[in-house]
Amino acid sequence: LDVLHNESCIYAADEPIEFKLRIKTKVPNIGDMSFRILVWQADETPIEIAFTKTFANINEIGEYDVEVAINKHNLAPGLYKLTIILSGGTSNANSENLDYVYPAFVFEILHADGTARTWPRQWGWVQLRDVDVKLIEE
């Protein structure tokens, strides 16, 4: 796994998390492939999961490079781990777990402005950043 554009693995709350993986297949005819990406709190509590769309149909033995971008993670400031699970199978059936990496990497989320203000754990782990509020005039 190669982390792209951020070797320190410290991200602002509004910054995408991007990485590249190399997949090596040892058997032919795997078929459709997708990822499940699981985000864990530093204490091993699962926080978020993403199910990707099928990104390839693999029928040949070989090596394949894949880029992944988590554009809006909504994570609150803190320390996290990422698990990447590679799944195979047709898109209209249950997929089979082919392989996984845990932890794929450890990363930290800071406030969007880069400051290190306190984020009390009782506030939660997911940050809702797209909320509109307006005053209702009488």
Give the ranges of each region predicted by the language model.
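Localized sequence-composition bias
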Residues: L1-E138
